Amino acid sequence: GREKLQKLNLDKTITLQYGDAETCDLADNSMDAITVGFGVRNFENLEKGLANMLRILKPGGQLCVLEFSSPQQFPVKQFYKFHFKYITPTLGRMFSKDTRAYTYLPESIKAFPDNERFTAILEKVGYKKASFSSVGLGLAAIYMAEK
């Protein structure tokens, strides 16, 4: 990522930080925006991680989360369930020694709150204007919220 920023001459404008969202010690009110792609469902404590990100955001700062979701429309829902129950684990056994990795993804998606519930959790933690948009036939959602 750092190399890409340098090539685009953005390395002085954008900084990349490595850390744990639940315990990150960045200063209060220090970030204009926080983006997370396919990571929030892996938080050990969802509300704690979201609250810590809220603490770090400046007033009016934006949170954008891209996360997998479970499609609700026929026939996408049925194909999705079939694929994750039968095809994904079979491919995992055929091509990988770590078959657990191929069962973890559908399990973690199933355990993650649905779109309305996750939006409610964002608001419970203290975010304002929490909303979501389904993308990819409902296979993922983009959540937006503001401090």
Give short role names for the model-derived ranges.
Residues 119, 123-147:
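Core SAM-dependent methyltransferase catalytic element
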Residues 1-2:
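Conserved SAM-binding loop
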Residues 10-11, 27, 128:
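Conserved H-loop
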Residues 32-46, 69:
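A short SAM/SAH-binding and catalytic strip from SAM-dependent methyltransferases
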Residues 66-121, 125, 131:
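C-terminal alpha-helical "lid/dimerization" subdomain adjacent to the S-adenosyl-L-methionine
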Residues 9-23:
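Conserved SAM-binding strand-loop segment of SAM-dependent methyltransferases
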